[in-house]
């Protein structure tokens, strides 16, 4: 109808203008007559066409004159809609260009992120393969130790058989000794003859007494060395106490930092609630807009039922837009749900951090218990030193009394029983250490399961990125198809407008020129807006690039710190090797002294060999304990490495969350410009669906990881049960053999007391000194070993505390960076909204001016 009115007005104005021109040029000069005749012919042709059109429109003139006043307003509205259609087409072209540029930028960003993710994924795979190889080696080592234990058990069984055979031979010897005793009773008379020999033996005993005094002096020197070692142990205990105080302070600092992190989390939760309220307000605005749009739609449906097919097509497009806006609303709801899920994940991670802090507190309590044990052992060493000094005084006073030395032999038997009890206590300590090692192995397996889950998550993210790239390509194709359709529609409109413009006169040309000027002004404003958006996008891109560079620099600094910590660990290992060399030198000196004492113990070789067999069994147990301690150290080192990898992965995860927050800001920008960027909303919908798929895949991967973890825990429990059974069997066999050896030693000592009292008493005194010296040396070695263990444990705890501090600092840095990014994005959104409002106001003013100018020109033509 609007086009019909426009044609009718143009025809009426042209007829009136022709008549007016004819009346003007009828009496002109003959110089311009030729030019006017050609003009008159053209005007006559136009008059003929106008007469035909007038005959065609005379029937409608009566109705149109009656409705002319009413349709003037409608004409203004229709002209406004036509201009809006042209403006919408131009805006769509500009938006298509923007979408292409955004797609190119997103493709470049996706390619860069894909390369980074591939590199990180490859590094994580390499680390995991190294850890799996290391675990395989440790497993093979455990199997070898198991085979060695089986071999040792077989050897113990063989030794048991040999001991039974030696028992039989000892019984036969006892029978022979009883016969010899009867013969000795018969030879009492011969002993009187041997009084002279006894005098000679007395002189020999005095010489041996002199030698024993010399040995007592040497033992005094050894006592002085033990006192020095005692002082050194006291210094080490003081250092350990200081370290424990420092660790308690560090634990308090960690608790304070955890409280700060909790407060930050509460602040973030409050901000999230504010954002949800803003989203609800946006939804309310959308609902109000949809209501207003429905009212306008009903109004125009009642008024414009008789319009052409172009307006119907525009109506269909608007209905499609409404559906797309409703889809975007649903997408926003799903995105809010995903944000709530991420919030739940963050709460779970905070709970895991609290669990790790509780584990550190348990480790500190274990260290305090070990410190108390060291203090108790130090008190026991002091008691031993006092006992040694008392025994030295007793030896000096009881040199002349052989009967008192027999009582001392009984005391030595009691000391052997005490030594057996001490060995049982040490065995219990070894069992506790093995249990701790098993607990740490369980923790290591738990961390390995977490790493496998993270690996699966990274693979799922890689697949999701590939699917997102495919979706973006499909969206680009759809956008190109829509652009081609829009261009075809524009071409059709252009051809129709050209046909109509050819039929119009010069006055309508002036109107067209004025409209072209207004359109040029609108295009200039649109170009300015586009340039502003482009500059803002480039500036935001530069900011993100600078943030990425800063994060890469922080990662390089963390790698450097890790290298420094590895250097410190190597230096500590070198120091440990030096201490082991010193221990080897001390053992060599002990071997020399043992060789010297073996000369005085030739008559007791058989008993000494049996005792050495028992000691070899104890040494095997100590070696197994050392191997378990070494494995424990390796497990702790492995745990530190796994923790570092977990921190790196958490940093990557936080970076991905920052990227997701940036995408959220982009989505908010798209909501602000949803009427002008519909295709961008489709792309965001695809990204939301992709994120939902990623969450589902992560849940599936988590379930698979849980099943694998349960299987590994079952296998570890079976292995620990087998090891405990083997240890219990070895302990039982060792106790039985020790009891048998003690019984045999008592029997042989009783026999030797009956036959060779004097020689046995001297040898027993020398043996007692040797035994005491060996006990003191072994006690000092055990104390040194325990001190070394405590130092290694304290170093490991300090490393763990440092790693926890570094993790907390990194978390604070990431939180501050994300907050800064969020504030920057919020400021950018506010600026973009202000600019959009200004642009809308400018467009409205231009439209009003355009509609006013067009209405004025139409009224002027109608009046003419």
Curated annotation (Swiss-Prot):
Keywords from the named record: Coiled coil, Cytoplasm, Motor protein, Muscle protein, Myosin, Phosphoprotein, Thick filament
PTM notes: Phosphorylated.
Localization, UniProt: Cytoplasm, Myofibril
Keyword Coiled coil appears in the UniProt entry: yes
Family: Belongs to the paramyosin family.
Functional note: Paramyosin is a major structural component of many thick filaments isolated from invertebrate muscles.
Name listed for the protein in its UniProt record: Paramyosin
Source organism of this protein record: Mytilus galloprovincialis (Mediterranean mussel)
């Amino acid at each position: 109808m609007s086009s019909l009115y426009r044609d009718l007005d143009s025809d009426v104005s042209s007829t009136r203008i022709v008549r007016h021109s004819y009346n003007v040029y009828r009496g002109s000069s003959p110089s311009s007559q030729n030019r006017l005749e050609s003009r008159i012919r053209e005007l006559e042709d136009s008059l003929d066409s106008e007469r035909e059109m007038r005959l065609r429109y005379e029937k409608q003139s009566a109705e149109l004159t009656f409705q002319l006043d009413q349709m003037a307003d409608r004409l203004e509205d229709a002209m406004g809609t036509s201009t809006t259609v042209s403006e919408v087409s131009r805006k769509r072209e500009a938006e298509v260009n923007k979408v292409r540029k955004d797609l190119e930028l997103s493709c470049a960003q996706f390619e860069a992120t894909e390369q980074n993710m591939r590199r990180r994924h490859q590094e994580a795979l390499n680390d995991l393969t190294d850890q799996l190889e290391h675990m395989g080696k440790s497993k093979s080592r455990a199997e070898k130790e198991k085979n060695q234990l089986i071999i040792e058990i077989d050897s113990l069984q063989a030794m048991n058989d040999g001991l039974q055979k030696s028992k039989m031979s000892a019984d036969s010897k006892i029978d022979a000794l009883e016969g010899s005793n009867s013969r000795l009773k018969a030879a009492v008379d011969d002993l009187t003859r041997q009084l002279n020999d006894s005098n000679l033996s007395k002189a020999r005993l005095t010489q041996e007494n002199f030698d024993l005094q010399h040995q007592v002096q040497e033992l005094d020197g050894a006592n002085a060395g033990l006192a020095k070692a005692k002082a050194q142990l006291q210094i080490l205990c003081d250092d350990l106490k200081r370290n424990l105080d420092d660790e308690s302070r560090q634990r308090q600092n960690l608790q304070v930092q955890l409280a700060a992190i909790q407060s930050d989390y509460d602040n973030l939760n409050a901000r999230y609630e504010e954002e949800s309220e803003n989203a609800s307000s946006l939804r309310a605005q959308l609902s109000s807009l949809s209501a207003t749009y429905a009212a306008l739609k009903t109004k125009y449906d009642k008024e414009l039922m008789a319009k052409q097919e172009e307006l119907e097509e525009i109506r269909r497009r608007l209905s499609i837009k409404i559906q797309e806006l409703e889809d975007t609303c649903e997408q926003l709801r799903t995105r809010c749900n995903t944000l709530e899920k991420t919030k739940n994940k963050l709460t779970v991670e905070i709970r895991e951090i609290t669990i790790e802090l509780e584990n550190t507190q348990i480790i500190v309590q274990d260290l305090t218990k070990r410190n108390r044990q060291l203090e108790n052992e130090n008190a026991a060493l002091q008691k031993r030193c006092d006992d040694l000094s008392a025994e030295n005084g007793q030896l000096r006073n009881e040199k002349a009394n052989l009967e008192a030395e027999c009582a001392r032999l009984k005391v030595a038997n009691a000391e052997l029983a005490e030594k057996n009890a001490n060995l049982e206590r040490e065995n219990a300590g070894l069992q506790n250490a093995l249990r701790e090692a098993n607990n740490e192995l369980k923790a290591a397996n738990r961390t390995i399961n977490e790493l496998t889950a993270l690996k699966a998550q990274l693979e799922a993210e890689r697949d999701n990125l590939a699917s997102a790239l495919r979706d973006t390509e499909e969206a680009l194709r759809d956008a190109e198809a829509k652009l081609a359709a829009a261009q075809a529609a524009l071409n059709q409109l252009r051809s129709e407008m050209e046909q109509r413009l050819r039929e119009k006169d010069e006055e309508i040309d002036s109107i067209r020129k004025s409209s072209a000027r207004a359109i040029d002004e609108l295009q200039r404003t649109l170009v300015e807006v586009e340039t502003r958006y482009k500059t803002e996008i480039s500036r935001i891109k530069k900011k993100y690039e600078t943030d990425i560079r800063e994060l890469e620099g922080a990662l390089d600094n963390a790698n450097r710190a890790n290298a420094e910590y590895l250097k410190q660990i190597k230096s500590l290992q070198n120091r440990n090797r030096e201490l082991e060399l010193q221990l080897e030198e001390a053992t060599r000196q002990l071997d020399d002294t043992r060789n010297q004492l073996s000369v005085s113990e030739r008559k007791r070789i058989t008993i000494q060999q049996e005792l050495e067999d028992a000691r070899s069994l104890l040494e095997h147990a100590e070696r197994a304990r050392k191997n378990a301690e070494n494995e424990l150290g390796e497990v702790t080192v492995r745990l530190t490495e796994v923790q570092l990898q977990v921190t790196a992965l958490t940093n990557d995860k936080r970076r991905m969350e920052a990227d997701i927050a940036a995408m959220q800001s982009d989505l908010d920008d798209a909501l602000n410009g949803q009427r002008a960027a519909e295709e961008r909303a489709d792309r965001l919908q695809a990204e939301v669906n992709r994120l939902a798929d990623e969450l589902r895949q992560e849940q599936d991967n988590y379930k698979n990881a849980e099943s694998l973890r349960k299987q590994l825990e079952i296998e570890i429990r079976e292995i620990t049960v087998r090891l405990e059974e083997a240890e219990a069997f070895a302990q039982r066999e060792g106790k039985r053999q020790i009891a048998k050896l003690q019984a045999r030693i008592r029997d042989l000592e009783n026999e030797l007391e009956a036959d060779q009292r004097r020689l046995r008493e001297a040898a027993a005194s020398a043996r007692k000194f040797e035994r005491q010296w060996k006990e003191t040396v072994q006690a000092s070695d055990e104390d040194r070993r325990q001190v070394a263990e405590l130092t290694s444990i304290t170093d490991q705890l300090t490393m763990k505390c440092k790693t926890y501090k570094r993790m907390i600092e990194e978390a604070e840095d990431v939180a501050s960076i994300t907050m800064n990014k969020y504030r920057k994005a919020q400021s950018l959104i506010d600026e973009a909204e202000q600019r959009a409002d200004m642009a809308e106001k400018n467009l409205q003013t231009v439209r009003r001016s355009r509609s006013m100018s067009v209405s004025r020109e139409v009224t002027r033509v109608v009046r003419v």
